[in-house]
């Protein structure tokens, strides 16, 4: 991901240890920004061998579904130029039909993003951008995943609500909605050759997404090129929803 200049800017990427969040964090870093990332493990070294690269990034442990942890989270930030909320949770094998699991997924995917947005509102005021990482599930339900679907649908309307509430502070709020992207969370699909082939046949571009495909859109929405864009969602699914 290139072509952007974020020199002197400060970015916070939750869920920035792997996957889409890490791809966005590394894009900001290459463009000159100071980048703070969060993950759920105790130390950055605990991600060795994973699909991300934390070199040059400031790592903090944070479970964004834990309200007390978010309240106590205190990175060294006075001014924040972008908050990217990429942390997410999903449960398989019908676990999301259990109310405890349903609540746990919503805490990470919906309540956490709301708490983070309000927590850093003052630091973002005047120049900031919030980008939530939603999903094509923001627009339609996914069988077997009621919590994930509900949380991502809620995140879409939260984006619109906060765009109106925060606009007067000079804060833009947008959402990216990826289709199937190669990551640890989606490995159950792309690591199965038959499932992968079936999915790719449905995608006009005949491939699933890569984290960098989504990172480019995130960097755009956080950049001055998107200065008049707020309250919107950008679907990035290779044409699957066309």
Predicted segment positions?
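Conserved glycine-rich cofactor-binding loop
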Residues: 17-18
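Substrate-binding pocket helix/loop in short-chain dehydrogenase/reductase
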Residues: 91-106, 199
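Active-site helix of classical SDR
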Residues: 117, 151, 159
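Residue(s) in the substrate-gating loop at a strand-loop-helix junction
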Residues: 135
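Short, flexible catalytic-loop segment of classical short-chain dehydrogenase/reductase
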Residues: 156, 173, 177-188
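Short, small/polar-rich loop/turn modules that mediate ligand/substrate recognition or access, typified
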Residues: 167, 172, 229-231
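C-terminal substrate-recognition "lid" of short-chain dehydrogenase/reductases
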Residues: 207-236, 241
């Amino acid at each position: 991901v290139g072509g952007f200049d974020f020199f002197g800017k400060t970015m916070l990427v939750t869920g920035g240890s792997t996957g889409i969040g890490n791809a966005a964090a590394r894009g900001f870093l290459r463009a000159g920004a100071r980048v703070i990332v969060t993950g759920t493990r105790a130390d950055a070294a605990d991600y060795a061998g994973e699909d991300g690269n934390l070199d040059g990034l400031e790592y903090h442990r944070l479970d964004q579904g834990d309200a007390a942890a978010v309240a106590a989270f205190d990175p060294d930030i006075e001014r924040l130029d972008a908050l990217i909320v990429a942390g997410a949770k999903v449960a398989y094998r019908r676990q999301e039909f259990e109310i405890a699991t349903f609540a746990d997924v919503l805490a990470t995917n919906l309540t956490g993003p709301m708490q983070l947005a309000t927590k850093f509102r003052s630091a973002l005021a005047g120049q900031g951008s919030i980008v939530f990482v939603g999903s094509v599930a923001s627009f339609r339900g996914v069988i077997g995943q009621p919590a994930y679907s509900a949380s991502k649908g809620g995140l879409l309307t939260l984006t619109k609500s906060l765009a109106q509430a925060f606009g007067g502070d000079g804060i833009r709020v947008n959402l990216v909605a990826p289709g199937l992207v190669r990551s640890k969370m989606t490995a159950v699909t792309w690591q199965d050759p038959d499932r992968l082939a079936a999915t790719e046949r449905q995608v006009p571009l005949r491939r699933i997404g890569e984290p960098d495909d989504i990172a480019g859109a995130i960097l755009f929405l956080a950049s001055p090129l998107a200065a008049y864009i707020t309250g919107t969602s950008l679907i990035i699914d290779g044409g699957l929803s066309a």
